[in-house]
């Protein structure tokens, strides 16, 4: 071998892609996915909120008469406000996704370390940890994004009523914040916060409780590993959990509707008691049918969008 020959130093391996950049791509694409799903389901979401809050709207004089059902609400809203009004409040709903996901990413490891038990350590311990972690994560996220959910609710339930000459109460997202802060302060933006957190815990408890109970009974034999069977079970469990926890959603939204009003509820229990006394238990479930339809529409859109992502990018973004 010649002394003049140079020994080539092997090149260092190319640096692995940064996790931060991977997170950013997933974060942005997940945002697009959420925006598509929420925007597609916005009409049924607004109908759900109008039906759910109609008794509060009647008391406030922002609705002239009750809705006879989902179709009647669709028809009257389209006639009185135009088709584009079905997307009223959707901007706040879409914006909500980004801080929620960022917070979940930032704190999920810490919360998991605090409450993340394995099923092998005991089902009761795992189940309690799951509820605690869900409640902690939900409360933390809600603390930052609850005002957007409040604004979305107020915009969606702000109808053009003949009682007030067709005038709306709010002229957009910023106007909701300005008027609420002026009349009620910061507390007005967080009315209904406590039942929202309780609702998250109740929903998660029902979801995991039903799923773990039904899965070993139904997903057996030829159905084990079946995507369709798993999807249907997930939909049934989600629908059941959301229906059972729906009264808490009604209570929190009815509390939201009182910000800016002279008469308010003295907390979640007072709200629940007065609704049942004046309107009956059935009033707590108004809009529940539309809520179930929204779940079907959202799942369908997400499934189609996931397939599109697989074709274009070879992966799904969440």
From Swiss-Prot:
Gene Ontology cellular-component annotations: membrane; mitochondrial inner membrane; mitochondrion; peroxisomal membrane
Topological category with respect to the lipid bilayer: Multi-pass membrane protein
Main location per the UniProt record: mitochondrion
Segments carrying motif Nucleotide carrier signature motif: 252-257
Catalysed reactions, semicolon-separated: ADP(in) + ATP(out) = ADP(out) + ATP(in)
Effect of residue 306 to K: Loss of transport activity. Restored transport activity
Gene Ontology molecular function: ATP:ADP antiporter activity; ATPase-coupled transmembrane transporter activity; cardiolipin binding
Subcellular location field: Mitochondrion inner membrane
Any one biological process term the GO annotation gives: mitochondrial ATP transmembrane transport
Domain notes from UniProt: The transmembrane helices are not perpendicular to the plane of the membrane, but cross the membrane at an angle. At least 2 of the odd-numbered transmembrane helices exhibit a sharp kink, due to the presence of a conserved proline residue.
Subunit structure: Monomer.
Function (record text): ADP:ATP antiporter that mediates import of ADP into the mitochondrial matrix for ATP synthesis, and export of ATP out to fuel the cell. Cycles between the cytoplasmic-open state (c-state) and the matrix-open state (m-state): operates by the alternating access mechanism with a single substrate-binding site intermittently exposed to either the cytosolic (c-state) or matrix (m-state) side of the inner mitochondrial membrane.
Name assigned to this protein: ADP,ATP carrier protein 2
Record organism: Saccharomyces cerevisiae (strain ATCC 204508 / S288c) (Baker's yeast)
Classification lineage: Eukaryota, Fungi, Dikarya, Ascomycota, Saccharomycotina
């Amino acid at each position: 071998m010649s002394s003049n020959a140079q020994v080539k130093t092997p090149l260092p391996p190319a640096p692995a892609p940064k996790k931060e950049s991977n997170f950013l791509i997933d974060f942005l694409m997940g945002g697009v996915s959420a925006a598509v799903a929420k925007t597609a389901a916005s009409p049924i979401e607004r109908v759900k909120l109008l039906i759910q809050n109609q008794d509060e709207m009647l008391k406030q004089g922002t609705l002239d008469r009750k809705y006879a059902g989902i179709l009647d609400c669709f028809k009257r809203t389209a006639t009185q406000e135009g088709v584009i009004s079905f997307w009223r409040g959707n901007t706040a709903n879409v914006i909500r996704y980004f801080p929620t996901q960022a917070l979940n990413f930032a704190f999920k490891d810490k919360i998991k370390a605090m409450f993340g038990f394995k099923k092998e350590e005991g089902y009761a311990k795992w189940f309690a940890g799951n509820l605690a972690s869900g409640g902690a994560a939900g409360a933390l996220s809600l603390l930052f994004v609850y005002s957007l959910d409040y604004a979305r609710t107020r915009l969606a339930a702000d109808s053009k009523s003949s009682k007030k000459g067709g005038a709306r109460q709010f002229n957009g997202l910023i106007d909701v914040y300005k008027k609420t802060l002026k009349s009620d302060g910061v507390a007005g933006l967080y009315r209904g916060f406590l039942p929202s957190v309780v609702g998250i815990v109740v929903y998660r408890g029902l979801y995991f409780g039903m799923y773990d109970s039904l899965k070993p009974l139904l997903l057996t034999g030829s159905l084990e590993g079946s995507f369709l069977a798993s999807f249907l079970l997930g939909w049934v469990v989600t629908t059941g959990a959301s229906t059972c926890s729906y009264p808490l959603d009604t209570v929190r939204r009815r509390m939201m509707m009182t910000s800016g009003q002279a008469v308010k509820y003295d907390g979640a229990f007072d709200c629940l008691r007065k609704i049942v006394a004046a309107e009956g238990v059935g009033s707590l479930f108004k809009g529940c049918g539309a809520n179930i339809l929204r779940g079907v529409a959202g799942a369908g859109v997400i499934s189609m969008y996931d397939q599109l992502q697989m074709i274009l990018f070879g992966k799904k973004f969440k």
